[in-house]
Amino acid sequence: MTDRLDDPALDRQLADHPDWTITSARTALTRSFGFKDFSEAFGFMARVALEAQAQDHHPDWSNSYNRVDITLSTHDSGGLSAKDFALAKAIDRIVG
């Protein structure tokens, strides 16, 4: 089981991820991405999928044409863990 981060740790981590929003229940991170078109959005999703598989930590996400919405949470900890912030960092690197 992965350890859930406490509130002070969440605040420290969130400071390093200013484009992400923490849910009001403090159990998930969310971010929306906009792209030029569907192909660009799908390419982004493919790159994120490969990274998520490598990290063995998978996002909840949706895609509508040029928009991708991502939610990160560690289900077995019942909230946010270091895994979520590691994947958020990788996603930020992918999107540039």
Curated annotation (Swiss-Prot):
A GO MF term: 4-alpha-hydroxytetrahydrobiopterin dehydratase activity
Xref: InterPro entries: PCD_sf, Pterin_deHydtase
Enzyme Commission identifier(s): 4.2.1.96
Keyword Lyase applies: yes
Single Gene Ontology BP annotation: tetrahydrobiopterin biosynthetic process
Highest taxon listed in the record's lineage: Bacteria
Catalysis performed (reactions): (4aS,6R)-4a-hydroxy-L-erythro-5,6,7,8-tetrahydrobiopterin = (6R)-L-erythro-6,7-dihydrobiopterin + H2O
NCBIfam families noted in UniProt: PRK00823.1-2, PRK00823.1-3
Similarity comment text for this entry: Belongs to the pterin-4-alpha-carbinolamine dehydratase family.
Name recorded for this polypeptide: Putative pterin-4-alpha-carbinolamine dehydratase
UniProt source species: Rhodospirillum rubrum (strain ATCC 11170 / ATH 1.1.1 / DSM 467 / LMG 4362 / NCIMB 8255 / S1)
Lineage per the UniProt record: Bacteria, Pseudomonadati, Pseudomonadota, Alphaproteobacteria, Rhodospirillales
